[in-house]
Amino acid sequence: MKHFQSKVLTAAILAALSGSAMADNPPPSTDEIAKAALVNSYNNTQDINGFKVGDTIYDINGNGKITRKTATEDDVKADDFGGLGLKEVLAQHDQSLADLTGTVDENSEALVKTAEVVNDISADVKANTAAIGENKAAIAKKADQTALDAVSEKVTANETAIGKKANSADVYTKAEVYTKQESDNRFVKIGDRIGNLNTTANGLETRLADAEKSVADHGTRLASAEKSITEHGTRLNGLDRTVSDLRKETRQGLAEQAALSGLFQPYNVGRFNVTAAVGGYKSESAVAIGTGFRFTENFAAKAGVAVGTSSGSSAAYHVGVNYEW
């Protein structure tokens, strides 16, 4: 049995009033009603502020008997709020909402930074692509077949000239004849030029292979960055939905509280009243209905319930007593 159910008290008061109005049995005494109402007020205060093991609580059975007891760990666990109280629950709710908002902001900043990294990688890829184009153009220019053919023609011409110089029939003076050393030197220079061209071509091929490898590496990094952006986007969407749900629940609760605060309590002794009110907060609205009874000039009780007008909203209720002196 949970500590003092406010709904049970309300039902007991209304049943007692209805029974006294419809039957000959005498209604409960003012002291009994006042005692039950004061106990209810005490427990409602605990519902708002919370209670812990060792605090004093009250139980009421089906016959309306009220028993005072010391709260145990089972009583705290059986409480709707776990002994925290409505104030603490609302404070935790507000803190959770603030934490989620901060997380959304952090993920947004991380997403912006990731986008900057992707832009930098894209710029590097474009630069490498341009460098590959330049290398290909340089290779085409250095290894141009026309240049090689020109070298070959020069080699052929030199061989012909050497053969002509060495022809005894054409020799007039010793100064006009190439020596063996001169001929060997000319062949060595030509061979060096051909070797240099081959070295240049090989170097350009190596640079081209390195550039292609760099492009492949950048492609892998770009794919990884795109995957990271997708994951961050998914998380951000989930956080947006969570924040939206919390915002909706908070606005619904405030609208229901506004509606409950508009309910009236009875003014005339011995009069029973029914009251209704509407309330709203930003885009949410709620409707509340309530009832009350003034027992004496000094003592009155009332109860009310509110429901939001939008789909998926939960109900809120209150039970209160008033004692004047």
From Swiss-Prot:
Positions of the UniProt region annotated as Outer membrane translocation of the passenger domain: 232-270
Span list, region Translocator domain: 271-325
Cleaved signal peptide residues: 1-23
Classification via SUPFAM superfamilies: Pili subunits
Keywords from the named record: Cell outer membrane, Coiled coil, Membrane, Signal, Transmembrane, Transmembrane beta strand, Transport, Virulence
Coiled coil stretches, renumbered: 86-135
Note: About 50% of hypervirulent serogroup B N.meningitidis encode this protein.
Subunit relationships: Homotrimer.
Comment text on domains: The signal peptide, cleaved at the inner membrane, guides the autotransporter protein to the periplasmic space. Insertion of the C-terminal translocator domain in the outer membrane forms a hydrophilic pore for the translocation of the passenger domain to the bacterial cell surface. The head region (residues 27-137) forms at the top of a long trimeric stalk.
Name used for this protein in its record: Neisseria adhesin A
